[in-house]
Amino acid sequence: MSISLKKSGMLKLGLSLVAMTVAASVQAKTLVYCSEGSPEGFNPQLFTSGTTYDASSVPIYNRLVEFKTGTTEVIPGLAEKWEVSADGKTYTFHLRQGVKWQDNKDFKPTRDLNADDVVFSFDRQKNTNNPYHKVSGGSYEYFEGMGLPDLISEVKKVDDNTVQFVLTRPEAPFLADLAMDFASILSKEYADNMLKAGTPEKVDLNPIGTGPFQLLQYQKDSRILYKAFPGYWGTKPKIDRLVFSITPDASVRYAKLQKNECQVMPYPNPADIARMKEDKNITLLEQPGLNVGYLSFNTEKKPLDDVKVRQALTYAVNKEAIIKAVYQGAGQAAKNLIPPTMWGYNDDVKDYTYDPEKAKQLLKEAGLEKGFTIDLWAMPVQRPYNPNARRMAEMIQADWAKIGVQAKIVTYEWGEYLKRAKAGEHQSVMMGWTGDNGDPENFLPPLFSCAAAKDGSNYSRWCYKPFEDLIQPARATDDHNKRIELYKQAQVVMHDQAPALIIAHSTVYEPVRKEVKGYVVDPLGKHHFDNVSVE
């Protein structure tokens, strides 16, 4: 970002704040969420982390269509209705009228949402000549990684309340794609005003949306304060204030939850699950995760450009030991990128067994009989797909040492970690993913396509034509059985080429205080508070 949140410290939005603490006295209509980290920014177009989405796209913004909370069902959002042409290449959206924009000290809207806002929100990502395209770094990982610059031929305004998307080809999951975070709608009027004022980056730092909550204050690594947006077009939130108490340590989050300093927390330590189940003041919600934890090998760096080396590093890791020690019963070993609960999963793929001798043989064939050194990046935050990255890194380090590979564990603050990984500084880096739309297309192309290798969300920087020749046709056809077959073949190719060590799928646990009513675990990993109350 051209002006980083790290440097800006506290974002003062010029609003008079009621003095409040995140400690003992939690007011009746205030909910405190113990979040796991600081967001990278407040424009969901620019980032891919769930931490950022929870702080931006979920409370502040809306999309043309939305996922019904707790499901992957697509429902109307800013668009009341839509039509799709017979050839599947033109989508016409009819906008909801009377949708109000939020405001701040720099901007007071003079109009409601209209088609210009929708066109701007997508043109910024697609059009390199758009004056906002390069603002805040201009990295649109989702949009580019999903191949949308080539898919979307045009986004055009039909009239103030109607927008058309013209595609170059049919795309089966396109409607669901528009419910994803990157497709959030931003205010063109706000953008124009900030551009004229010479401060375009404020659009991404001081967000203006149409969503249920409005940002009041952000203090990096401390807290985010929101208020219910009084002009919200949907059902009004049941709480007046929403506070994100940024708490990276899962044990500290749990301690705060026990003391009622927060009412909802994500990503508990697996070791705490049993105690949470016995705690009379806590409701422990759970469901199978639509997720995966993995370790990407940077295939642009030697010796990881050699498939035998990648296979050797994969054979060398005892995944079952990791599942027991790190996930403690809340995960299962993964052999494919997509989770087994998702359609298109290929159960015929045979996972790499734990076989150090096979690993040594492969290194010998690669001319590395004496081993080599490698950096191993460990995530600084807990995620459902990786509840203890440091412990996992130590176990992988020990396993690799047995075959002569010496690993140095590296970590950074979460935002810096992602920034450096996107730039390809790593040799191996721990990452993970929670599905955004319930479609295999949301796992394979964003994480391992050639387009994603260019924009940074393919942390393996792996571009392999036989893989592309399977995943791209799978996106274009609306023949469901054909899509299943193509995705199954793609999983075989990925398994054989081993651009990443695929580690685990986890069960998602969400501990909430008994006073919290209406909270729903989201299969897509988001944390929604607009329909939540605190008694």
Each language-model region and where it sits:
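A structural "hinge/loop" feature
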Residues: S38-D54, L78-A79, K105-K108, A172-S184, ...
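N-terminal lobe/hinge region of extracytoplasmic solute-binding protein
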Residues: C34-A86, D123, I208-T210
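Ligand-site clamp/hinge motif
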Residues: E201-D204, F229-R275, A393
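Gly/Pro-rich hinge or "lid" segments in bacterial periplasmic/extracellular proteins
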Residues: K68-T69, D150, D160-N161, E171-P237, ...
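Detector for C-terminal structural segments
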Residues: T30-L31, S35, A55, A172, ...
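Structural transition elements
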Residues: F213, A333-A366, R383-R391
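Aromatic- and charge-enriched surface segment that lines or borders ligand/interaction sites
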Residues: E80-P131, Q164, P303
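Surface-exposed binding/hinge segments that line
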Residues: S2, H94, N127, P131-A191
